[in-house]
Amino acid sequence: MEMFQGLLLLLLLSMGGTWASKEPLRPRCRPINATLAVEKEGCPVCITVNTTICAGYCPTMTRVLQGVLPALPQVVCNYRDVRFESIRLPGCPRGVNPVVSYAVALSCQCALCRRSTTDCGGPKDHPLTCDDPRFQDSSSSKAPPPSLPSPSRLPGPSDTPILPQ
């Protein structure tokens, strides 16, 4: 019996990690419908737009001996294929570009956090509200402007993944 326990311990230590679950977690990482608040500094309006974002669970691993072995990279739900759409905010003063672009998720994947497509800093307290305090009451518009320009592909920031420290 002691030999069996020793062999089992050796097997666990040699793996270095264990899966959080053998069954896929539900709901898995996938595009979902979402309503986002859109505003721009200098424009006196905050509107909401309907889009798709990546959300859901990704399988992760954890070390059995966390103090002895280095941390494993953790994956998060990221955009795989994305297109960018643009809208024109109404009522922006002269000299302020009224065009705002936002991502539309076409497909998603579990991967290291990519700053070009993912907010790696954690959840926002109120993702459906505007940051400007003037727009946090019920007077903000809840519908997109009637005329939306055609979608455009915009260059994104560098695609540098965040690695664990």
From Swiss-Prot:
The gene is CGB3. One of its GO terms (molecular function) is hormone activity. High expression in the placenta throughout pregnancy. Glycans are attached at N33, N50, S141, S147, S152, S158. This is Choriogonadotropin subunit beta 3. Pfam families: Cys_knot. It is found in: Secreted. Residues 143-154 have a biased composition (Pro residues). Residues 1-20 form the signal peptide. PANTHER family: CHORIOGONADOTROPIN SUBUNIT BETA 3-RELATED, GLYCOPROTEIN HORMONE BETA CHAIN. Keywords: Disulfide bond, Glycoprotein, Hormone, Pharmaceutical, Secreted, Signal. Belongs to the glycoprotein hormones subunit beta family. Heterodimer of a common alpha chain identical in LH, FSH, TSH and HCG and a unique beta chain distinct in each of the hormones. CDD domains: GHB_like.
